[in-house]
Amino acid sequence: MPKIQTYVNNNVYEQITDLVTIRKQEGIEEASLSNVSSMLLELGLRVYMIQQEKREGGFNQMEYNKLMLENVSRVRAMCTEILKMSVLNQESIASGNFDYAVIKPAIDKFAREQVSIFFPDDEDDQE
């Protein structure tokens, strides 16, 4: 294993020493300044790399919003076409269960209820 020698301020040294003491009290016999320092260095390096990925564009909110809008629009168009087929189907007309005047308010109510689960304030704004 490669060796790295670093200098730290007294506060950092005391905190690492405290961690070693706690680990030894927990029964971890191989706890040492070297082991704990190595663990902290690895964790810090992981955090640093994650931050760099985010800066380089790991997640793009605008692209996500665009993708979600596109998919929701497709689903809405498909549902509209399916609803048209159901309303125009002679069997559906004969049964009376697929009257557009009844279906549309039921769909609107369902959508409002689902949205209000996550966005309860929006329901108050619409009324």
UniProtKB/Swiss-Prot annotation:
This is Relaxosome protein TraM. Homotetramer. 2 homotetramers cooperatively bind to DNA although they do not contact each other; cooperativity is achieved by DNA kinking and unwinding. Part of the relaxosome, a complex composed of plasmid encoded TraI, TraM, TraY and host-encoded IHF which binds to the F plasmid origin of transfer (oriT) in a site- and sequence-specific manner. Interacts with TraD. Probably also interacts with TraY. GO terms for molecular function: DNA binding. Conjugative DNA transfer (CDT) is the unidirectional transfer of ssDNA plasmid from a donor to a recipient cell. It is the central mechanism by which antibiotic resistance and virulence factors are propagated in bacterial populations. Part of the relaxosome, which facilitates a site- and strand-specific cut in the origin of transfer by TraI, at the nic site. TraM binds to three principal regions in the oriT (transfer origin) region; 2 are required for autoregulation while the other is required for plasmid transfer. Plasmid specificity is conferred by the TraD-TraM pair. It holds the Pfam family Tra_M. InterPro entries: IHF-like_DNA-bd_dom_sf (IPR010992), TraM_DNA-bd (IPR042073), TRelaxosome_TraM (IPR007925). GO terms for cellular component: cytoplasm. Keywords: Conjugation, Cytoplasm, DNA-binding, Plasmid, Transcription, Transcription regulation. It comes from the Bacteria. The gene is traM. Transmembrane segments: none annotated. It comes from Escherichia coli. It is found in: Cytoplasm. Belongs to the relaxosome TraM family.
